[in-house]
A protein has these predicted regions:
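An active-site-proximal structural segment forming one wall of the substrate-binding cleft
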Residues: 153
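Residue-level recognition of beta-strand termini and adjacent short loop/turns
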Residues: 37, 148-150
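Transmembrane beta-strand segments that form the barrel wall of outer-membrane beta-barrel proteins
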Residues: 9-13
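Surface-exposed loop/interface segments of Gram-negative outer-membrane beta-barrel transport/assembly proteins
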Residues: 1, 15-21, 29-140, 156-207
Length: 207
């Protein structure tokens, strides 16, 4: 018989600084066949993968990170260290007790433009206001048997299958950047998906 196996690992940190857009995947492939007798051969082709992804906002009601990168004005700093530096609307929101987010790595406020009010705001704010991830397992393969009871005739029975399971979670906190970029609510969502597919084929060839 013959046996082949391979293992592959991918760890892609994405284009956004930090760990908010990552893709990790561990996958394996097994191909094998064995001649049980002169007239029957069995085999399998099987692959399995386990993946884990985290992503940043690409679209949505409150802007997205990539638009924020392209539209924020060049005069706005990345951070404000003190509320006295805030734009007027941001100062008002701060005085009203709105949640002005800080970067958890340095304790500084995300800066917001004093010249432009749009629904995108600071790219780092778009990056950090939501935590979301998706993880799952995929299993797919084929089992087969080739039966040759006499010369020139082959009967094949083949069973193909695919099984998938995934879970996704997302969590957002209240925040304020400007009159268009804000949320007063916590948001939590979760979903689970399971699917399976199979196909059984039987056919014969005679040459």
């Amino acid at each position: 018989g013959h046996f082949f196996t391979s293992i592959n690992y991918v760890n892609n940190d994405g284009i956004v600084r930090g760990d908010k857009d990552v893709y990790k995947r561990l996958s394996a492939q097994i191909n094998a066949d064995y001649k049980l007798y002169d007239w029957i051969t069995v085999g399998t082709n099987t692959s399995i993968e386990n993946y884990n992804t985290k992503s940043v906002s690409q679209h949505g009601r409150y802007g997205n990170l990539m638009n924020a990168v392209m539209t924020i004005d060049p005069l706005t700093p990345v951070y404000y260290s003190d509320p006295s530096q805030f734009a007027n609307t941001m100062k008002q929101a701060y005085d009203e007790g709105k949640n002005i987010l800080k970067d958890p790595t340095n304790g500084l406020y995300y800066a917001t433009s004093k010249y432009i009010d749009d629904d995108n705001g600071n790219p780092l704010l778009q990056r950090d206001k939501t935590d979301s991830y998706n993880r799952g397992i995929n299993l797919r393969g084929t089992l087969y048997a080739n039966i040759t009871p006499f010369k020139g005739f082959t009967f094949t029975s083949r069973f193909g299958y695919r099984v998938a399971q995934s879970n996704s979670h997302s969590y957002s906190v209240p925040y304020y950047a400007n009159k268009q970029t804000y949320s007063d609510e916590y948001s939590i969502s979760a979903s689970a998906n399971n699917s399976w597919y199979y196909q059984w084929e039987n056919f014969a060839n005679y040459n």
